């Protein structure tokens, strides 16, 4: 999501009660500061058909987005926020966090210009990865933004244009201009082969990284056929795999169906979604793409303000994509962003909790049935004092006990289905009561 730099009615859905199986533990900010051993052992996440696998066992996960971590780690006075949010996630039983591994030509830029990097910012990303490992959290790292926030494809096009080699000033030329493709490949190789100054491990050899994401929310509206974006995905995914054979890779799609999937077009939120140059099934079907990503933003995607309509859309949207994973793609489906805007008319936190509960319930049912819905990441978690990063989706989880409880319940339920990871054991003992 990231808007800027900081930037059928009456349908009821059955929700399985679980409060009796969970002991809710409230976190105060002061509780977050705990000692964690640095010798946490993590294994690479792999794929076996439609399931994620860790140490040979199915891995269904519960997680969150905190896109801002590298940016905040640059400033010593704000560095504590990274440790706080990662420790909070671990205490909630969460296992995966998605964040940005890019900042192109902007304030605190990682990539100052094509091929020029800020070592101070790179060390901040080193710190984020090292802290995630210490807390037993795996990171999903995104490599560029389709949006202008943190530079994105707009910055790559500007670089090529300023150097007199750009084919067009259109942002979409990022996908077809040989110069921007070359810039991006160089960036990708530099990041993947980076040796962490704290751990001494190259990123491509570090199991702390759950997966790479090519681009956040790609769209290419100048080519509605989808051919331009498809060609870019084919080239870039093959390139990533040539550099890093250890990690999983996804595109970063929102999940919209395109012209190659005519029978699925009615699942899209509105007609415009099939005309933005993306095609969920086509883009995700490549052999170099290990799993598919989907976002869930019914209030931003539809004009219908009715809350029950939004829940109905979420239900249909998620089940359609899980079915795609099971039958068409035969790959895991990861819901990498979901949120409900606080700017909606008549918004209440209770309404948002209900929205999230529907999503988490669908994911739980996917886990107990061994389906392709592999995990979900809420957008977004913050710590106190981050108002400038709070788009209309930000949540400080320990300030909302009901919201906090939803996620801890989900962690406990998933652990009961698949067993707890070694990195979760101590926290889950505190969160989850035993079934009688």
Pin down the residues of each PLM region:
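Active-site mouth of glycoside hydrolases
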Residues: 33-332, 338-354, 358-363, 367-427, ...
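N-terminal signal-anchor transmembrane helix specifying type II single-pass membrane topology
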Residues: 2-33
């Amino acid at each position: 999501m990231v808007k800027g730099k900081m930037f059928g009615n009456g349908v009821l859905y059955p929700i399985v009660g679980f409060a009796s199986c969970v002991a809710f533990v409230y976190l105060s900010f002061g509780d977050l500061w705990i000692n964690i051993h640095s010798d946490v052992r993590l294994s690479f996440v792999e794929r076996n058909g439609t399931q994620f696998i860790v140490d040979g066992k199915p891995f269904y996960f519960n997680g969150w987005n905190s896109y801002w971590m590298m940016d905040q780690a640059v400033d010593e006075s704000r560095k504590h926020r990274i440790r706080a949010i990662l420790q909070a996630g671990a205490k909630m039983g969460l296992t995966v966090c998605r964040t940005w591994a890019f900042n192109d030509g902007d304030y605190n830029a990682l990539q100052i210009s094509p091929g020029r990097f800020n070592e101070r910012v790179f060390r901040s990303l080193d710190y984020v990865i090292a802290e995630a490992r210490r807390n037993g959290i795996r990171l999903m790292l995104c490599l560029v933004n389709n949006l202008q926030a943190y530079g994105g494809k707009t910055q790559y096009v500007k670089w090529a244009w300023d150097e007199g080699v750009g084919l067009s000033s259109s942002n979409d030329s990022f996908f077809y201009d040989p110069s921007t493709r070359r810039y991006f490949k160089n960036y990708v190789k530099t990041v993947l082969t980076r040796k962490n100054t704290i751990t001494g491990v190259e990123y491509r050899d570090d199991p702390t990284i759950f997966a790479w994401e090519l681009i956040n929310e790609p769209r290419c509206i100048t080519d509605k056929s989808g051919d331009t974006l498809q060609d870019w995905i084919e080239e870039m995914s093959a390139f990533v795999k040539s550099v890093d054979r250890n990690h999983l890779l996804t595109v970063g799609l929102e999940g919209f169906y395109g012209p190659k999937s005519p029978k699925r077009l009615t699942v899209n939120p509105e007609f415009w979604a099939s005309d933005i140059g993306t095609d969920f099934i086509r883009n995700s079907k490549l052999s170099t793409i290990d799993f598919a990503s989907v976002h869930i933003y019914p209030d931003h995607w539809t004009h219908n303000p009715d809350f029950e309509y939004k829940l109905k859309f979420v239900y249909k949207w998620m089940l359609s994509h899980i079915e795609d994973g099971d039958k068409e793609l035969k790959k895991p489906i990861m819901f990498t962003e979901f949120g409900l805007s606080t700017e909606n008319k008549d918004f209440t936190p209770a309404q948002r909790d209900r929205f999230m509960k529907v999503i988490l319930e669908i994911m739980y049912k996917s886990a107990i049935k061994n389906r392709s819905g592999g995990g979900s990441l809420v957008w977004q978690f913050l710590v106190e004092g981050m108002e400038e990063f709070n788009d209309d989706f930000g949540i400080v989880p320990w300030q909302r006990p009901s919201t906090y409880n939803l996620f801890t319940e989900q962690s406990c339920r998933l652990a009961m289905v698949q067993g707890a990871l070694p990195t979760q054991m101590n926290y889950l003992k505190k969160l989850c009561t035993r079934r009688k």
